Regions:
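Bacterial N-terminal signal peptides that target proteins for export
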Residues: 1-8
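Bacterial Sec-dependent signal peptides at the C-terminal "C-region" and cleavage site
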Residues: 12-24
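Acidic/histidine-rich, surface-exposed loop or edge segments in extracytoplasmic proteins
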Residues: 25-33, 83-91, 128-136
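Metalloprotease/metallohydrolase-associated module, dominated by Zn2+-dependent proteases
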Residues: 33, 38-78, 98, 123-167
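Active-site scaffold of zinc-dependent metalloenzymes
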Residues: 68-99, 111-114
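Residue-level recognition of phosphate/Mg2+-coordinating polar/acidic sites
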Residues: 102
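Catalytic Zn2+-binding segment of zinc metalloproteases
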Residues: 108-124
């Protein structure tokens, strides 16, 4: 049994090393990867939010979703497992590219709002967090924050800045 402990420790360190190298922001398609890359290139705000998420305990799946539950964009806490929280952000693919970038920034701010509060681990704690920092929007299951609205406006401004190529 004494020999097993070094092996367990080695395996644990290997798993932590792999987790540390894995990207935290995971686009679920090539088109979404292109959008995330374009958004980070065109908007310093989006680039900064992505860095904050990469430094957190959140793994974010970003995907396009076209249905009535996502008229523009949405973010949800999927689950938490051990030291990791899984979050998913949806963007409506029918919107113009510029609008998708603005909404991506908005939703990334919500992800940061989750990431900066380690107590957000389930639906109840997420509801409590967003009740404390925001307000109910579009029904009992949706919340909004002033910070996310401000980020959306900032990204819009960055995309409109002179010398910025239009997406």
């Amino acid at each position: 049994m004494k020999r097993a402990w070094p092996m367990v420790l080695l395996l644990s360190l290997s798993v932590l090393s792999i987790a540390a190298r894995s990207p935290r922001v995971r686009p679920q398609s090539d088109h979404m990867a292109d959008l995330v890359q374009l958004a980070a290139k065109r908007s310093p705000t989006v680039a900064g939010l992505l860095k904050m998420i990469e430094a957190s305990d959140v793994i974010l799946q970003v995907e396009f979703r076209l249905d009535n539950t996502v008229p523009r964009a949405a973010t949800q806490l999927v689950t938490s497992a051990g030291l990791v929280r899984y979050v998913r952000t949806y963007i409506n693919p029918r919107l113009p590219t510029r609008r998708r970038i603005e909404l991506l920034g908005h939703e990334l701010q919500h992800v940061v709002e989750i990431a900066t509060d380690p107590t957000v681990r389930d639906d109840a704690s997420m509801r409590a967090r967003f009740t404390a920092i925001g307000w109910v929007s579009d029904g009992a299951a949706s919340f909004e924050t002033a910070a996310a609205i401000a980020v959306e406006r900032q990204v819009r401004s960055e995309l409109s800045a002179p010398g910025t190529r239009r997406p």
